[in-house]
């Protein structure tokens, strides 16, 4: 009766997780996203655990969610997963007012960002 299910956007050997409305500027979030691109998930998790950036905690949660999606929803082997994509997008920007001297005002921008992580299963072929 209802609509047919939409075809899967990702290939069968990939899984995705999205973290929306992270309270950090996209530039700062991209610094941490660059850190994990192309790495095996075990190495990426270790890098995020020891990163001193505040947002690394949220990126780690998103990566763990992508790993769980791969394991539980798509039956992929966790040991063979690699971070295929980790990209950042802009979300909304809250605008605030800061009173300054002589009756002036300054605008404070509080940006938000979205993070998408795609993991792919890469099987090691026997050579």
Curated annotation (Swiss-Prot):
Protein's UniProt keywords contain Ribonucleoprotein: yes
Cellular component GO terms held in the UniProt record: cytosolic large ribosomal subunit
Keywords per UniProt: Ribonucleoprotein, Ribosomal protein, RNA-binding, rRNA-binding
InterPro entries registered for this protein in UniProt: Ribosomal_uL22, Ribosomal_uL22_bac/chlpt-type, Ribosomal_uL22_bac/org-type, Ribosomal_uL22_CS, Ribosomal_uL22_sf
PROSITE patterns given in the database record: RIBOSOMAL_L22 (PS00464)
Pfam families noted in UniProt: Ribosomal_L22
Disulfide bond sites: none
SUPFAM superfamilies associated with the record: Ribosomal protein L22 (SSF54843)
GO biological process: translation
Stretches assigned to coiled coil: none
Top-rank lineage group of the source organism: Bacteria
Gene Ontology molecular function: any one: rRNA binding
Keyword Ribosomal protein attributed: yes
Role this protein plays: This protein binds specifically to 23S rRNA; its binding is stimulated by other ribosomal proteins, e.g. L4, L17, and L20. It is important during the early stages of 50S assembly. It makes multiple contacts with different domains of the 23S rRNA in the assembled 50S subunit and ribosome.
Quaternary state and interactors: Part of the 50S ribosomal subunit.
Family label: Belongs to the universal ribosomal protein uL22 family.
Protein name: Large ribosomal subunit protein uL22
């Amino acid at each position: 009766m209802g609509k047919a299910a939409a075809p899967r956007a990702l290939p069968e050997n990939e899984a995705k997780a999205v973290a929306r409305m992270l309270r950090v500027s996209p530039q700062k979030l991209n610094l941490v996203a660059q850190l994990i691109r192309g790495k095996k998930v075990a190495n990426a998790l270790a890098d995020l655990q020891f990163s001193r950036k505040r947002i690394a905690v949220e990126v780690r949660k998103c990566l763990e969610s992508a790993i769980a999606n791969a394991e539980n929803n798509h039956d992929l082997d966790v040991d063979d997963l690699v971070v295929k994509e980790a990209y950042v997008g802009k979300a909304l920007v809250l605008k605030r007012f800061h009173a300054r001297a002589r009756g002036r005002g300054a605008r404070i921008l509080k940006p938000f960002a979205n993070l998408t992580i795609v993991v792919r299963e890469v099987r090691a072929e026997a050579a």
